[in-house]
Each structure stands twice: as structure tokens, then as C-alpha cells.
């Protein structure tokens, strides 16, 4: 009893298998939650514990937005909340045009010398904070659908970060 794959004449696959190696590539360093941003940086050879500062820095780089030493970049997601519960993490698959309008409105109403909003793609945007404290606990919305939004708002890890968390 053999499977179709075992019976098939597959010299190229057999050669690749004979010359290749099997193994496990660990792309998530100890202490980090599994996520594409961590895995991708690890695969590209970055020392994640030394350089990773969150999705915001990746978002800024992809948008060509410079982040100074005294600034922090935060990913700013548009999401859907219904009756206080996170309905979905993508703002109902919002279009780029609708999203840009919302982010530019936020910049007009809330932006100042310390806080700036930058439109990105669909629900993924950038918030740049000058002089903010990075000791924050941020929960990615895609990890918590169905959760009360109040339970997963940004939280300060220590007292010094309270002002930044309250933004």
C-alpha cells in the first residue's frame, strides 16, 4: 500500500529532498509574542531584542517617515467597535480613501507639536509622539476580537509612562 506521492516519478523533488536538510527555524526569540513583525525581522537577521520597538517603527519606515531619537512611532489602527466590543480589527476593510480622510481629520483635531498622525494603507496608520515614554503595553486589535475595547486600551507599564498612555 503506497500513496500516490510514493508511487509518482518525481526525480526533481527526490533530488531536492536528498540534497536538502530538514529542521526547525525558530523565528521568535524567547519572551516575544509570535507575530509577523518579530518573525520577519528575525529571518532578515536583525537582533530583535536589540532593535525592535514595535510595529510603529516598521510602519514609519514603510511610509518614509523619519523618527528622531526623542520621538516614538506607534501603529495606529482603525477598528470597528460596536457597543463597546471590538467587532473587527480592520475597520470593516476600510478603503484607503476613507481611512485617509479619517486620519487627516484626527491630525487636524488632535495633532500638535507633540502628536502627529500619518495616513497609511487601509486600517494601518502611524502615530508619532515627540518625547513619549515607550514603557507601554499595547494590544494588537487583531489579537482580541470580541473583547471590550476598554479592557485593551494602551496601558502604562510604569508610572513614568502614564502621561503617554493617557494621550
Give the ranges of each region predicted by the language model.
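Active-site nucleophile/metal-coordination loop of metallo-enzymes that catalyze phosphate/sulfate
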Residues: 2-112, 122
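Glycine-rich, mobile lid/loop segments that gate access to catalytic sites or pores
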Residues: 90-167
Amino acid at each position: 500500500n503506497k500513496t500516490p506521492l510514493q508511487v509518482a516519478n518525481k526525480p526533481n523533488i527526490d533530488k531536492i529532498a536528498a540534497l536538502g536538510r530538514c529542521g526547525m527555524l525558530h523565528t521568535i526569540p524567547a519572551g516575544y509574542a509570535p507575530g509577523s513583525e518579530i518573525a520577519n525581522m528575525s529571518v532578515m537577521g536583525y537582533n530583535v531584542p536589540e532593535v525592535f520597538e514595535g510595529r510603529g517603527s516598521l510602519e514609519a519606515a514603510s511610509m518614509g517617515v523619519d523618527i528622531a531619537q526623542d520621538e516614538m512611532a506607534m501603529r495606529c489602527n482603525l477598528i470597528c467597535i460596536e457597543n463597546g466590543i471590538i467587532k473587527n480589527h480592520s475597520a470593516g476593510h476600510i478603503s484607503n480613501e476613507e481611512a485617509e480622510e479619517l486620519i487627516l481629520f484626527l491630525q487636524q483635531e488632535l495633532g500638535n507639536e507633540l502628536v502627529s498622525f500619518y495616513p497609511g494603507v487601509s486600517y494601518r496608520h502611524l502615530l508619532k509622539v515627540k518625547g513619549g515614554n515607550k514603557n507601554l503595553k499595547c494590544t494588537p486589535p487583531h489579537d482580541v476580537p470580541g473583547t471590550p475595547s476598554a479592557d485593551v486600551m494602551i496601558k502604562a507599564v510604569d508610572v513614568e509612562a502614564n502621561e503617554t498612555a493617557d494621550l
